[in-house]
């Protein structure tokens, strides 16, 4: 069993939904309840934009490190925006984490779990929202480098998804 922990914005929710479908397709059972984690593997998808969200992500990682040290968790993986931006620092400061992945490393995580031959991220998602709405990502990144914003540092240049892919995802949801 695997615990998937979502930190931060709704953008992360879409990423978690992609992970869930891949885990299901590869035979993993999962849970999203960070208040009652029960899995032997934990994947924490972090936020790295706002100071409070960064701290919450770090606190959550440390809580799961404690579970691992107590023998209640076998493997701990961290991914998402925080680890994309601060991977080297996190690896140095929290060596108990088995592996830090960036924001775009879904296939590498599956490979680490022994499922390298698993499906690709084709946009098919396991929806965790109520049936009447879903988040649809239309782009990633930003080309502006505002002094107060870390989006371009973390996610790179603005890249739009192909229009046909977006429309197909919306059709699949209706």
What are these regions (language model features)?
Residues 1-174:
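Proteins enriched for Cys/Gly/acidic motifs involved in redox and nucleic-acid/cofactor modification
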């Amino acid at each position: 069993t695997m615990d998937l922990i979502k930190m931060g914005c709704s953008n992360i929710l879409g990423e978690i939904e992609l992970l869930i479908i891949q885990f299901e397709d590869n035979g993993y059972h999962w849970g999203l309840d960070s208040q009652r984690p029960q899995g032997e593997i934990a994947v924490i998808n972090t936020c790295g934009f706002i100071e409070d969200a960064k701290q919450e992500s770090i606190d959550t990682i440390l809580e799961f490190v404690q579970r691992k040290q107590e023998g209640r968790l076998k493997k701990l993986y961290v991914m998402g925006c925080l680890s994309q931006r601060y991977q080297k620092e996190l690896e140095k400061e929290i060596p108990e984490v088995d592996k830090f992945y960036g924001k775009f490393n879904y296939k590498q995580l599956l490979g680490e779990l022994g499922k390298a031959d698993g499906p690709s991220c084709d946009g098919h998602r396991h929806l965790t929202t109520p049936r009447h709405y879903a988040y649809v990502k239309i782009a990633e990144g930003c080309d502006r480098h505002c002094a107060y914003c870390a989006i371009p540092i973390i996610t790179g240049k603005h890249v739009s998804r192909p229009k046909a892919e977006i429309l197909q995802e919306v059709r699949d949801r209706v």
